[in-house]
Curated annotation (Swiss-Prot):
Membrane topology listed for this record: Lipid-anchor
Species whose genome carries this gene: Macaca fascicularis (Crab-eating macaque)
Cysteine methyl ester modification, residue list: 203
Protein name from the UniProt record: Ras-related protein Ral-B
Predominant place of localization: membrane
Chain ranges passing through the membrane: none
SUPFAM superfamilies for the chain: P-loop containing nucleoside triphosphate hydrolases
Length: 206
């Protein structure tokens, strides 16, 4: 399933987001709510669904490409390939299922292993189903403490009420954008350094 692409989008900045987490935590529901303003409660798990949408990020038109990966162990072997293509990750668990919170550590380790050559990986920890407070199994303090330990932001969302849905996607895109700008600056700095060295060498030869 994919959103329709319009002409002219190819020239816009593209931010690639990967949805990660156990099965049934609401990754697809969050994605569909963000994409189409729809709450889909029952969703058949697949290997992965890709979506693309044009949005305005801090006054700039950009594209967000969302890959919604399946959380089932059956797909663990192919998950590495999806992670390699990602620029940022929403690590999702359900606040009503502590086991899904525990699983985030393993998913994070897999991301870090696949992206080992990168310094700081844009990642947010997302506690979904905040509308089911009466069924909460994961205390806010516990989730926030884990996120702080990992040096990332923790946000609670509800795909049903749309609470903080836009926030997590836009905050992650900002982190991706910041990382890209930093990398481009480093590349330009190295290139400038090489040019200066080349100029000095030419001067010496003269």
């Amino acid at each position: 399933m994919a959103a329709n692409k319009s002409k002219g989008q190819s020239s816009l900045a593209l931010h690639k987001v990967i949805m990660v987490g156990s099965g049934g935590v609401g990754k697809s529901a969050l994605t569909l709510q963000f994409m189409y303003d729809e709450f889909v409660e029952d969703y058949e798990p697949t290997k992965a669904d890709s979506y693309r949408k044009k949005v305005v990020l801090d006054g700039e038109e950009v594209q967000i490409d969302i890959l919604d990966t399946a959380g089932q162990e059956d797909y663990a072997a192919i998950r590495d390939n999806y992670f390699r293509s990602g620029e940022g990750f929403l690590l999702v668990f359900s606040i009503t299922e502590h086991e899904s919170f525990t699983a985030t550590a393993e998913f994070r380790e897999q991301i870090l292993r696949v992206k080992a050559e990168e310094d700081k990986i844009p990642l947010l920890v997302v506690g979904n189903k905040s509308d089911l407070e009466e069924r909460r199994q994961v205390p806010v303090e516990e989730a926030r403490s884990k996120a702080e330990e990992w040096g990332v932001q923790y946000v609670e969302t509800s795909a049903k009420t749309r609470a903080n849905v836009d926030k997590v996607f836009f905050d992650l895109m900002r982190e991706i954008r910041t990382k890209k700008m930093s990398e481009n600056k480093d590349k330009n700095g190295k290139k400038s350094g090489k040019n200066k060295k080349s100029f000095k060498e030419r001067c010496c030869l003269l």
